[in-house]
From Swiss-Prot:
InterPro entries: CBM2/CBM3_carb-bd_dom_sf (IPR008965), CBM3 (IPR001956), CBM3_sf (IPR036966), Glyco_hydro_5 (IPR001547), Glyco_hydro_5_CS (IPR018087), Glycoside_hydrolase_SF (IPR017853). Residues 1-29 form the signal peptide. This is Endoglucanase. It catalyses: Endohydrolysis of (1->4)-beta-D-glucosidic linkages in cellulose, lichenin and cereal beta-D-glucans.
Amino acid sequence: MKRSISIFITCLLIAVLTMGGLLPSPASAAGTKTPVAKNGQLSIKGTQLVNRDGKAVQLKGISSHGLQWYGDFVNKDSLKWLRDDWGITVFRAAMYTADGGYIDNPSVKNKVKEAVEAAKELGIYVIIDWHILNDGNPNQNKEKAKEFFKEMSSLYGNTPNVIYEIANEPNGDVNWKRDIKPYAEEVISVIRKNDPDNIIIVGTGTWSQDVNDAADDQLKDANVMYALHFYAGTHGQSLRDKANYALSKGAPIFVTEWGTSDASGNGGVFLDQSREWLNYLDSKNISWVNWNLSDKQESSSALKPGASKTGGWPLTDLTASGTFVRENIRGTKDSTKDVPETPAQDNPTQEKGVSVQYKAGDGRVNSNQIRPQLHIKNNGNATVDLKDVTARYWYNVKNKGQNFDCDYAQMGCGNLTHKFVTLHKPKQGADTYLELGFKTGTLSPGASTGNIQLRLHNDDWSNYAQSGDYSFFQSNTFKTTKKITLYHQGKLIWGTEPN
């Protein structure tokens, strides 16, 4: 009996810690396929990165800071936490060449090897980054680069999760045709003698912004991609125009470095601009890696000063940038794109017409995000035109600016509309509602919208107290609720508004 009680208490404790974000979610439990087990050898098809089955893959992850400075954050424990809690599928080991990096201290390559070995064990992809920066012309240390990549490719040529990035950010008096392309041809030749298949990423001019130049004079190798780097506070539509041009020319792009800050790595964070960039990358299925995993006191860092070097970070140890990046990786994990859950059947004797089912994507009463998941179902006998239907989720924001994201919708996130409405007179459990609408679509009798997964957060990423919100309740399965209201052409047709 005592043993049974002990087991029960242990299970309860694990459940509480998991809900509180102190332990990895069940999605990371043993038995779940790792990214590499699922996708295997990567290759290029057109402009797309594809897996062994030829299906498009979008990798998302984070980069180390310079290994010579912040290498202590790069270890198996931290990468495991990033895989299990953040959901990363790729990690970038940024080995600076100058500034106390490989050229002055070749032993820093041992940290690269540690990262690769950890990634192999954990089943995630890893980018070996020859991180030129102040030494802006890649030819300055070309022979050292060839020496380094000869060693790396001889070690990992049969390892499908390795990706080579052979010139981080060429800059200064450097151009593609004269400097970067000839360098790349020589280094690629060295790698291909040992590794015929793995992806190679080549930096482009002006700190890896001139993908348009590379697109006009592409390398011959079939599995080469071109690096695009941006910082949300500095770079905008003009750089996306360059990316669009490169894609139109058939040049595959990998964003191996981007930051929520300005180009200095400090200043900001610029979350609206970051969101605009990530929406763009998602629309093109472009893989990305965020800068950076460190506790350096600058806005692009993911961790606050003094955070653990081995993972296990509570949300309070994450910076605004780290919180944003974590949620944008977690929100698009493969688990949200599997076959949608089948909702429980409505009781047709009680629920005529259109109804709502809900579950809490984040059941914590104190959380920096609200994640309602909805099904809207037609229980009636007539087809419903969704463009005439809106749903309202009622909650308290306490005068904070609101942000909306759609993590997944069976009918497509692009088919949704939304607006936040502040009540002139607060009601019980609500001073605001989110109104969700639809651009197109119909629901035939008995049909459902399928799973709609939403995510809301305050501008400053502060916590909500969800326990007081009218529409919120803790449920990890879909349940019918009348506290999320439905309207047809503005007229209430389902549920009860708060008093």
